[in-house]
Design a protein with these regions (language model features):
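Non-heme Fe(II) oxygenase catalytic core, chiefly the N-lobe of the double-stranded beta-helix
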Residues: 2-12, 68-79, 88-230
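Fe(II)/2-oxoglutarate
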Residues: 1-77
Length: 230
């Protein structure tokens, strides 16, 4: 017990510290509509928001803070994910960005400069690393329009606070391509179990709190298309 009477937690953790029963119990928790009153609906335990409704209150600081507080709570103690319909209002921008990115993929494949996908054999899938910079160089005006989105900064600030930094990658998993292995996209998400043993327990959640991952669907993505599984 610590001074406050709470059970003491170990400083060092390893694989034996993790119990599958705890994980199963966590993922089986349902999402209560009362915990996400601003969501338009809940699908597969995921709160879904209407981008138009959020944009309608952009000038209302109190309403926006309420949305951000709800999202932060979802990330911290809820299902860990929020989804948006109509996050973008200019779908032609999405289509144009897609065309530019496809061109970048083709150019990098021809020149063998793309770097490839670290989950599959060379050439099986396609990656565009540092896609933001490459899009900006290829079409600065399109880059600006693509990033003139009100929702992405709000969601990012809800978890990371102000002055966050954005990095983007494109990942194309082709039919027959090897699926990604299970991982967490943050500083400690790709290290081996042996390496992770050198970090005290309190650093693990801190590292996760410093990163937020989002995805923008550029096309219809049914399950058959192999979207990222959460």
């Amino acid at each position: 017990m610590d001074r406050m009477g709470a059970p003491s937690e170990p400083v060092w953790i390893d694989q034996e510290s993790c119990r599958l029963e705890d994980f199963s119990r966590a993922v089986e928790v349902d999402t209560d509509a009362g915990d996400v009153p601003l969501a338009d609906e809940i699908i597969s335990k995921i709160p879904v928001y209407d981008g138009d409704r959020v944009r309608a209150v952009l000038d209302d600081a109190g309403a926006i803070r309420a949305y951000m507080a709800e999202w932060a709570t979802v990330f911290r103690t809820g299902p860990g994910i929020v989804a948006f319909r109509r996050a973008f209002t200019e779908l032609d921008v999405i289509d144009r960005v897609t065309e530019v990115l496809i061109g970048i993929i083709a150019d990098e494949a021809e020149s063998a400069t793309g770097g490839g996908d670290h989950f599959a054999a060379a050439g099986a899938n396609s990656r565009v690393w540092n896609a933001h910079e490459k899009l900006c160089v290829a079409d600065p005006e399109l880059f600006a329009r693509y990033n003139a989105n009100d929702l992405i900064p709000l969601v990012s600030r809800s978890w990371l606070g102000a002055l966050f930094q954005v990095t983007t990658q494109v990942n194309v998993v082709r039919p027959g391509g090897k699926a990604q292995t299970c991982h967490r996209d943050y500083h400690m998400g790709f290290q081996t179990s042996q390496q992770l043993k050198d970090y005290p327990a309190h650093i693990h959640p801190v590292s996760a709190a410093l990163t937020l991952q989002g995805a923008i669907a550029h096309c219809d993505m049914p399950l058959e298309s192999g979207p990222t599984k959460l």
